[in-house]
Amino acid sequence: MTAGEKEKSGAQWVNRFPTSRDVADLKGDFKGDFKGKVQKFLAAIEAAGGSVSISATYRPPERAYLMHYSNKIAKGKIAADKVPAMAGVDIDWVHDTEAKSKEAAQAMVKAYQIVFQPALKSRHTVGAAIDMKVGKIVGKSVKNADGTSSKIVELSDLHAVGQTYGVIKLITDPPHWSDNGR
């Protein structure tokens, strides 16, 4: 490719602009903002003997753009030639035919493992969300932010504990927690 030339869409784009899995990439510091709230909540889970597996924290806007529009093209909700450009993402969504454009977008959707329409802007793109799986916590007691303990009889009991830290569960999205529950 020469300077200024765009690269065709396809699964090769999925490894670019990776989503972070690091709490350090969330907004804020240990004392105040979302990062600090998450750090304290995770520390409480681990102190109780639970385990945490993080699948996503900060998602670069470029990745959100690629996910959002690849899914829209794949589902036939937008034509490849109607996708707005994004600075810093030199992708050419348009292939020789609309069918090939859609096929390339479908390859991206499959590689991203997209199930629901990804948001162009989300709590992840501003560093205010975490996707995580919590294990080994049922039957244990976890400290709330005020120091009292809550018995975790079933995993959903952890939602109220998270809320005390300002880490709010989005019920409809199993791994998703954020600063506002969205």
Q: PLM ranges: what are they?
A:
Residues 2-171, 175-181:
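Cell-envelope/glycan interface and biosynthesis
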